[in-house]
Amino acid sequence: MLILASASQARRNLLEQLSIKYAVMVSHIDEGKYNSQNVKELVQALSFAKTESVVSEYIFNCRKENKALAILGCDSLFEFDGEILGKPRNKSEAICRLEKFSSKSGILHTGHCLMYRQNLNNKVIGKSFDGIICDVVSTRINFSELSNVEITKYVETGEPINCAGGFAIDGKGAVFIKSIEGCYSNVIGLSLPWLRYALNKAGMSLWK
């Protein structure tokens, strides 16, 4: 069974799309403690911290079926003109960002961390996981020209406030995106091709 260390509904939707059996345990880390001018280093550190936080809390019954178990943590940030952007703090900031994005491009980076084990001999997974697989997947996003009216109406829906960068490719914000270069699901918050790769490397499979 896979444990998702995230409260993100978008990431849950991606796992459900694959009919993966999973549970959710929300990590409780202070993201403000993590600072780096390198966006890839930052998303990787955050995804690792989220995974490690859940691993340390997850205690299971060793008498359960002896199946591989993995914990997955992710974190996404948007890089635009040298700035690292998380979720907008308010509607005004969301509007300001989208005005800047008009007819330009940025890169959505998602850090992924999978901690896994292939036996359940110990009750505390944090003391006996078999391996860690971490990586960052990046997708370039090219925006269409956006009018002020469109931007204001979009922000009024509330959708941008919940998204890294301030837009959702799997929601109403999709109409603003001219094209992408790279993994689509990565922009949503979890690269499914990366997940397949990581699970295979961990000796697990999407098809079991």
From Swiss-Prot:
Q: What is its EC number?
A: 3.6.1.9
Q: Which cofactor does it need?
A: a divalent metal cation
The UniProt record lists the keyword Cytoplasm: yes
Where in or outside the cell?
Cytoplasm
Q: Which Pfam families match?
A: Maf (PF02545)
Gene3D superfamilies from the entry?
3.90.950.10
Q: Which reaction does it catalyse?
A: a ribonucleoside 5'-triphosphate + H2O = a ribonucleoside 5'-phosphate + diphosphate + H(+); a 2'-deoxyribonucleoside 5'-triphosphate + H2O = a 2'-deoxyribonucleoside 5'-phosphate + diphosphate + H(+)
Q: Which GO terms describe its cellular component?
A: cytoplasm
Q: Which GO terms describe its molecular function?
A: nucleoside triphosphate diphosphatase activity
- Which of the seven top EC classes does this enzyme belong to? hydrolase
Q: Which residues form the active site?
A: 75 (proton acceptor)
Cited InterPro entries: ITPase-like_fam (IPR029001), Maf-like (IPR003697)
Name a single GO biological process. Answer: nucleotide metabolic process
Q: Which UniProt keywords apply?
A: Cytoplasm, Hydrolase, Nucleotide metabolism
Q: Which domain of life is it from?
A: Bacteria
NCBIfam families, per database record: maf
* Family statement: Belongs to the Maf family.
Per its database record, what is this protein's job?
A: Nucleoside triphosphate pyrophosphatase. May have a dual role in cell division arrest and in preventing the incorporation of modified nucleotides into cellular nucleic acids.
What name appears for this protein in its UniProt entry? Answer: Nucleoside triphosphate pyrophosphatase
Its gene name is maf
